């Protein structure tokens, strides 16, 4: 299982696949933990867009815990808006 992340590196946009772990669903979308592209920390992103929910955690468990809290705090409406915005950015890339 992998997530495709949109990365801007040296003013160049590219899509980078990263291995995803422990997926969970919320608000009709699937999220999972993955290692950060350029460091050894853990992030949580949405599958279809790579929309980052939580970043730079030292453990996978903490990244998942913090991501779920963040998603609940932000609320369904705002999460869905952010995912739609991420989809538009991917189309433009």
List the predicted regions and their residue ranges.
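Short aromatic-glycine-(Arg/Gly/Cys) micro-motifs in beta-strand/loop hairpins
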Residues: 36-52
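Short, solvent-exposed coil/turn segments at beta-strand boundaries
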Residues: 26-30, 47-49
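Mixed-charge, Lys/Arg-enriched low-complexity segments
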Residues: 52-93
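Generic structural motif
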Residues: 3, 31-33, 44
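Short linear motifs in intrinsically disordered
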Residues: 12-14, 30-37
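Negatively charged, low-complexity tracts enriched in Asp/Glu with abundant Ser/Thr
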Residues: 1-27
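A short, sequence-level motif marking secondary-structure junctions
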Residues: 21-23, 36-38, 57-62
């Amino acid at each position: 299982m992998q997530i495709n992340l949109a990365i801007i590196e040296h003013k160049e946009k590219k899509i980078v696949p990263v291995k995803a772990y422990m997926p969970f669903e919320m608000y009709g979308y699937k999220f999972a933990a993955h290692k950060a592209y350029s460091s050894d920390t853990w992030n949580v992103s949405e599958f279809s867009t790579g929309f980052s929910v939580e970043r730079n955690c030292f453990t996978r468990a903490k990244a998942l815990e913090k991501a779920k809290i963040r998603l609940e705090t932000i609320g369904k409406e705002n999460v869905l808006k952010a995912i739609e915005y991420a989809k538009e950015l991917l189309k433009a890339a």
